[in-house]
Amino acid sequence: MSQTTTNSASETLGFQAEVKQLLHLMIHSLYSNKEIFLRELVSNASDACDKLRFEAIDQPGLLDGDGELAIRVDYDKAARTITISDNGIGLSRDEAVANLGTIARSGTREFFSQLTGDKQKDAQLIGQFGVGFYSSFIVADKVTVLSRRAGLAANEAIRWESDGQGEFSIAPAEKAGRGTDVVLHLRADEDELLNGWKLREILRRYSDHISLPIRMAKEDWDAEKGEQVKGDELETVNQANALWTRNKSDITDEQYREFYKTVSHDYDDPLAWTHNRVEGRSEYTQLLYVPRHAPFDLWDRDARRGVKLYVKRVFIMDDAEQLLPSYLRFVRGVIDSADLPLNVSREILQESRDVRAIREGSAKRVLSLLEDMAENKAEDYATFWTEFGQVLKEGTGEDAANRERIARLLCFASTHDGEQAQTVSFADYVGRMKDGQDKIYYVTADTFTAAANSPHLEIFRKKGIEVLLLSDRVDEWMLSYLREFDGKSLVSVAKGGLDLAELADEEEKKRQSEVAETFKPLVERLQQALAEQVKEVRVTQRLVDSPACVVVGQNELSPHLLRMLKAAGQEAPEVKPVLEINPDHALIARIRDASDAEFGDWAALLLDQALLAEGAQIADPAAFVKRLNGLLLKA
């Protein structure tokens, strides 16, 4: 942040570069849904009151005799302003600079790099990022914030002001009571918002569920003036009770959607939600949502989580990661406990038996929601899987109690249709298994293309046996925990000695035995030439079109996992592969007849070729090219 002007009374500061970019994009991308500014500002006001209520548990003096928390919305036609006021926690000078001048979130730069210039696509991305206070500038060409932090004196208030063009000023101010007033100086074409009926309509649509009263001046018809006139009496324009405390039958889908947008600051509707009251040993209410799009910081393990914790309707914290396991970190919503103490700390949350019960119950509830979506709303589940599938896979290792349920929700690409889209479940695979087949086969690779073109698949394609194509970074980790499904082992086609005996007839088995004996001299010759690079050379039945491939032992780390470990700077053991040769390939016949002078080059070329086909890097590319050119010239 750059400082441009300073004096004892006022400072003019430059917005963080990302804020400038966000303001510009928002004004141009979100204008078609400009009314969200009021939802965002009312939501911020509600959060400020929630935070005061929480801090006042330990510091009752912060309430200063004014314990009735509320939000007020007013407008002034003559001044062309809309004011949103609250008597919540307020802002100190440093908090105003930090919260109204910067975006203190990791991954911000990466987020902006995804923007395309397409208004519709950018609007969705900005919605995932969260617009908050800055949405004011969609309808205002100047915003003034007058705020006094609870516990500070009247003369320690601040006045923040900006036209959204790149700078803001901040100065000391006087304010009689704690809290914040946000004054929007409307743009010239926004007169329709200077209307009590219009503002009430927006508030009831977007903010009816806010648990605090939202008040406006009562208006009566003035026959002389021919218009509505504001009086001194205030009226509450929303229902002012927490949405999650109402009966499900009393809540419309539209109200559920708008509540989601408030708690998540998302621009889009959610994919699904679950609202449930749990009674028994632990009593709590949960209203949990699955978003339609992944947030930009989904893979940031330190990012704030999306579930707000309340205790007896009193807000406690808004990133309580203990309430759901990490693999469900995309879930948004609220959990309201009747059992936890109001002064609960993060340390208590980690040790509380009630919190463990909430965590387990909430995880099961979300999994039930996903199961219902997978079974009854295939299109929605496909959207969910595209956005969050890799995160859900983490659950196979993190949540042993629900591992089987999670396994049933997993989707993969497969040789069945050859498409990159991950649409095949384990149940789909099992339903198509060949008679006599008792294993689920898979291959892992760095990319889908590498997996789909792996030489290890050749015999499976020939026999019509389906293989799952795994190329997500999390897949290898998942497989270390997920060893079977419905009693059927998960088997890598690139590990160990391939055993398809149950699918081979007697004649085929006899031929395999004869071939192994016939090629024994070549195998021994290759083993001697490649003794430093490979553990073993053997004849294989797994190849059809390729001359050779490399495999590792059944209990060894796969080459794909070893590459990932090295790329992450982790120590990775040196694993010598097994070289398998295809006795029916013309190149193997050529090598079989090679002279002793050429044999070493042929053997090295065969191994390097197999390593490249598997996706590995060869140790000496220059030597590979030299050998290849030399053998081509002799051909």
UniProtKB/Swiss-Prot annotation:
It holds the Pfam family HSP90. It comes from the Bacteria. GO terms for cellular component: cytoplasm. Residues 564-635 are annotated as: C. Keywords: ATP-binding, Chaperone, Cytoplasm, Nucleotide-binding, Stress response. PROSITE patterns: HSP90 (PS00298). It is found in: Cytoplasm. Residues 347-563 are annotated as: B. The keyword ATP-binding applies. Gene3D superfamilies: 3.30.230.80, 3.40.50.11260, Heat shock protein 90, C-terminal domain (1.20.120.790), Histidine kinase-like ATPase, C-terminal domain (3.30.565.10). Residues 1-346 are annotated as: A. GO terms for molecular function: ATP binding; ATP hydrolysis activity; ATP-dependent protein folding chaperone; unfolded protein binding. Homodimer. Molecular chaperone. Has ATPase activity. PANTHER family: HEAT SHOCK PROTEIN 90 FAMILY MEMBER. Belongs to the heat shock protein 90 family. This is Chaperone protein HtpG. It comes from Bordetella parapertussis (strain 12822 / ATCC BAA-587 / NCTC 13253).
